[in-house]
Each structure stands twice: as structure tokens, then as C-alpha cells.
């Protein structure tokens, strides 16, 4: 059956998706924490960490666990969509700490090969910071619900927030 919902209503629903919004907020907070840690630990201002992969904490883990927590909180933790969101979260976190990390370690070794073994090596070395340690994934996975659930419970949906600020979208 074809849905006759007007496109503006679909856009409104999309932008008012609390699970999506708060999952993305958790991801953003994790990325900002990377910048803060760069300043605190390495004593340097390097905004590039905001768009790089790897590092503490895992923003992908924060994204998927924050989203899954919102889905569970909204629909119930026995709902099939929560099960799906949780399984996707586990796959993403396994990938970050397993496969992507292994690829980064391999790149590190390849970059360390002597020039005599690899005479046609690219001028730019392979990217080594691809994945996360288990601790980085754990911290990200705890940050997700810690950011998303209070946002969902106390602030609500994005359009609800904007209408409360006087934007007239409610």
C-alpha cells in the first residue's frame, strides 16, 4: 500500500525522531570528549580529532548504544526493534575493537617495513588509527545511554525542545 503522507509530515517525523537525535547527540559528545582529552593529555589543540576514527572514547559505540537504549526505553526492552538495535550495537562494537583494530595494527607493521622490502611504497603511510581498544569501546558504550536516556527523558524530542524555546514548531 502506498503511503499518502505528505512529504513535510515525513520530514517532520524524521527530524522529531528522539532515538536518532539522542543517539547522534551521544556520538557528538563522545567526539567532543576526544578533543578535550587531546587538550588535557597531549596539551595540543587539534580539532582534526573530531573527524578521525579511533581514539578514546569510541563515538560509534556511543551512537549505537545510545540509540539502542532510546529504542528500548521508548518501545520496551522486550520489543523486537530493541533486539535489532542491540544486535547492531554488538556488531559495531565487535568490529571496532576487533576487525578495524586488527587492520590498524597491520597498517602499522606495513608502514614499518624497510624501503628495501617495499620500494614502491606510497608516499603517504597507511592510516594506523582505525579501531579501538576494548576500554575505548567500553567507555563509548557507557556514554551512549548516559547521554541519550537523560536527554530523552528530561528534554524529549527535538521538535518538543524547539517549541519550548519558542520556535513555534510544536
Please place each PLM-identified region on the residue numbering.
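The first (N-terminal) embedded transmembrane alpha-helix
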Residues: 1-4, 25, 142
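A glycine-rich beta-to-alpha transition motif near the start of alpha/beta enzyme domains, typified by
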Residues: 37-46
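Helix-boundary and loop/linker segments of multi-pass membrane transporters
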Residues: 11-16, 41-42, 76-77
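N-terminal membrane topogenic signal
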Residues: 15-18, 136
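Short, strongly hydrophobic alpha-helical membrane anchors
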Residues: 1-15, 162-170
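N-terminal targeting leaders of membrane proteins
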Residues: 7-11, 22, 43
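Membrane-embedded catalytic cores of phosphoryl/pyrophosphoryl-handling enzymes
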Residues: 28, 32, 47-170
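N-terminal signal-anchor transmembrane alpha helix
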Residues: 17-34
Amino acid at each position: 500500500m502506498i503511503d499518502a503522507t505528505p512529504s513535510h509530515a515525513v520530514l517532520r517525523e524524521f527530524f522529531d525522531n528522539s532515538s536518532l537525535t539522542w543517539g547522534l547527540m551521544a556520538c557528538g559528545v563522545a567526539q567532543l570528549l576526544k578533543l578535550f582529552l587531546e587538550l588535557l593529555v597531549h596539551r595540543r589543540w587539534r580539532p582534526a580529532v573530531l573527524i578521525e576514527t579511533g581514539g578514546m572514547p569510541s563515538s560509534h559505540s556511543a551512537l549505537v548504544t545510545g540509540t539502542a537504549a532510546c529504542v528500548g526505553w521508548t518501545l520496551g526492552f522486550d520489543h523486537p526493534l530493541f533486539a535489532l538495535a542491540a544486535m547492531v550495537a554488538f556488531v559495531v562494537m565487535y568490529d571496532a575493537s576487533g576487525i578495524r583494530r586488527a587492520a590498524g595494527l597491520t597498517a602499522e607493521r606495513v608502514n614499518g617495513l624497510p624501503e628495501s622490502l617495499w620500494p614502491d611504497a606510497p608516499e603517504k603511510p597507511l592510516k594506523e588509527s582505525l579501531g579501538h581498544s576494548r576500554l575505548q569501546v567500553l567507555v563509548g558504550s557507557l556514554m551512549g545511554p548516559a547521554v541519550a536516556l537523560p536527554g530523552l527523558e528530561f528534554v524529549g524530542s527535538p521538535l518538543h525542545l524547539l517549541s519550548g524555546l519558542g520556535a513555534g514548531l510544536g
